[in-house]
């Protein structure tokens, strides 16, 4: 198979879809890999490293899309890429269709086969291709939140861990999945007073056993969220419904409960966000205010640490990518239920129910 690895062009997206090690695995199996020039530079991989691994370098993104049977990316195609995706082409990347109607309709129109990292799902309902980036995003959410709590950055000027005689900052984490757990553990390690909430009592019971003493668990409800917002300095939203829009758990009227200069970090923004006042931002312009509350809603948080993120992501994606190229997408997805759940849009049809429901599009069950 001919595989293409384009350079990511989303704002400040510095990751790359395949490392030289991945290229080597592909080429030794007889596949051909084309990498766009400088695609891996920001992740620490030179064009020469790709060439040494067996890749061929192409100068433009148009060249890569035109020749490849399969595209391996990190983030969803942006508007300028829509015309490049063609009928029958397999695109393996994060899509987050439920957050973008234009993207969904463009991929339906293209006739491509869209296999989304975020909906590849194991029998235990874990999401193996989302976990590594969720680990990064959870840690980064606290790191960025801490930075923007500083007064010169627009926050209220609180130190996360406090000092002797001065209370630490209060961090409220909504959602106790991979992102939330990583965020709570990171904030606790910095000495903050942390509360994490979720709708799953078994999950909270588990966290109560394994988390540091400065992490408290709380059952998620509108009442409890409102109460926590009254004293929270940093709120991290990390709610996920696989493939679907995130629920809006913090409404605009709730912002009036918070102190001015408090910070909201919405890690769920790539699924539409879990705060009513959230809208996607970029690493160049990451924040904005609503009613005196600082919002950080960058949709590609891990893109700021591309070396770590690229290695973590490709460690997880490569085994699945190898199945797709060795067997072809139909047989690979027929043989592997985990991969099959990654199919969202196939040859003009939406085959993932939550995506169809998000935009009122016809849903067609997958036929392999």
List PLM regions with ranges.
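Short glycine-/small-residue-rich Rossmann-like dinucleotide-binding loops
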Residues: 69, 75-76, 95-96, 221, ...
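Rossmann-like adenosine-cofactor binding region
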Residues: 209-291
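Adenosine-phosphate binding glycine-rich loop
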Residues: 118-144, 148-159, 269, 274-368
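Residue-level detector of alpha-helix initiation sites
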Residues: 76, 136, 177-178
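An N-terminal-biased, well-structured beta-alpha scaffold segment characteristic
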Residues: 2-106, 110
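Glycine/serine-rich phosphate-binding loop and adjoining beta1-alpha1 elements at the start
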Residues: 2, 8, 79-169, 298-300
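Glycine-rich phosphate/diphosphate-binding loop of Rossmann-like nucleotide-binding domains
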Residues: 6-45, 152-237, 287
């Amino acid at each position: 198979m001919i595989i293409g690895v384009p350079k990511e062009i989303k704002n400040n997206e510095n990751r790359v879809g395949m490392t030289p090690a991945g290229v080597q695995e592909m080429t030794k199996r007889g596949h051909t890999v084309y990498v766009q020039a400088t695609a891996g530079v920001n992740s620490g991989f030179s064009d020469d490293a790709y060439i040494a691994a067996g890749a061929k370098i192409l100068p433009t993104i148009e060249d890569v899309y035109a020749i490849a049977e399969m595209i391996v990316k990190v983030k969803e195609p942006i508007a300028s890429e829509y015309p490049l995706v063609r009928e029958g082409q397999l695109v393996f990347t994060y899509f987050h269709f439920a957050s973008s109607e234009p993207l969904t309709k463009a991929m339906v129109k293209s006739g491509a086969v869209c296999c989304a990292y975020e909906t590849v799902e194991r029998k235990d309902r874990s999401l193996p291709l989302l976990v590594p980036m969720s680990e990064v995003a959870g840690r980064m959410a606290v790191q960025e939140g801490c930075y923007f709590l500083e007064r010169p950055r627009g926050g209220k000027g609180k130190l996360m861990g406090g000092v002797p005689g001065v209370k630490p900052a209060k961090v409220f984490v909504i959602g106790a999945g991979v992102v939330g757990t990583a965020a709570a553990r990171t904030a606790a390690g910095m000495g903050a007073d942390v509360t994490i909430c979720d709708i799953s009592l078994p999950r909270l019971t588990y966290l109560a056993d394994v988390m540091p003493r400065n992490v408290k668990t709380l059952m998620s409800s509108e009442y409890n969220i409102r109460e926590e917002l009254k004293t929270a300095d940093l709120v991290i939203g990390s709610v996920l419904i696989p493939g679907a829009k995130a629920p809006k758990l913090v409404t605009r009227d709730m912002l009036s409960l918070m102190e001015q200069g408090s910070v909201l970090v919405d890690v769920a923004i790539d699924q539409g966000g879990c705060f009513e006042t959230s809208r996607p931002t970029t690493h160049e312009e990451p924040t904005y205010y609503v009613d005196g509350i600082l919002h950080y809603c960058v949709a590609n948080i891990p893109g700021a640490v591309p070396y770590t993120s690229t290695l973590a992501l490709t460690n997880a994606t490569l085994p699945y990518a190898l199945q797709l190229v060795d067997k072809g997408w139909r047989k690979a997805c027929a043989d592997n239920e985990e991969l099959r759940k990654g199919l969202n849009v196939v040859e003009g049809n939406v085959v993932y129910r939550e995506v169809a429901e998000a935009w009122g599009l016809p849903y067609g069950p997958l036929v392999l």
